Amino acid sequence: PFIYDALSEIKVRGNSTALADKKGYNFKFSSKNNLFGFGEAKKWSLLANAYDKTLIRNKIALDLAKDMGIEYSPESTFVDVWLNGKFVGNFQLTESVEARDCRVDIDIENGDWLLEIESSRVETDVDYIITPEYGIRFAVNEPENITKEQQREIYDKIGKVETAIKSGDYSSVENVIDTKSFATFYVFSEFMKQVDFSYSSTRFYFKDDQKEADLQRKLRLENNKA
């Protein structure tokens, strides 16, 4: 067994799932740990799978995403969890979503971005951008605490993507997004019935001036019941 005594932070995770009796958690170590060979990192997540009696649908989804070639799909495994000396159930340990070479391999220091579609949730320490053409609301996951210049740069880059899509010119779209990654992610989301993937908790990243779709999310209540 592995024993780690460096836990520095733990909090309830999720939106609708945070209301379940069996809650999921995000937790952080004070130093990096390589859990189950997934790579060294401080931040990790425990999915409760509270609305899935089988407990396996999120695991199947993440494994399918990897088989379909969706980049940076989180590694995960099942674990039994004790909290304050009490057994609280079987959970799915996953990598948290963050820009790291062993997770989402993008270079934040040199202008890459990690964004999240979030239509309504408001967090005081997060910057948000509403796109010019379609009014889509993005949370800027990384970098944190962006400057007005960075905010404008992100706004303009997303604006170019939307302008290309609106033009109906496929070659223009190919110039600003990785169309294969978007198509693969769309097919995956349709197959898994991810009814919220277009408006909440769906992440994208800009890397080397190109926008790519990426899984990096959990399946929500609706998908677990599908």
Which functions belong to the PLM regions below?
Residues 1-226:
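Phosphate/dinucleotide-binding and metal-coordinating scaffold of catalytic cores
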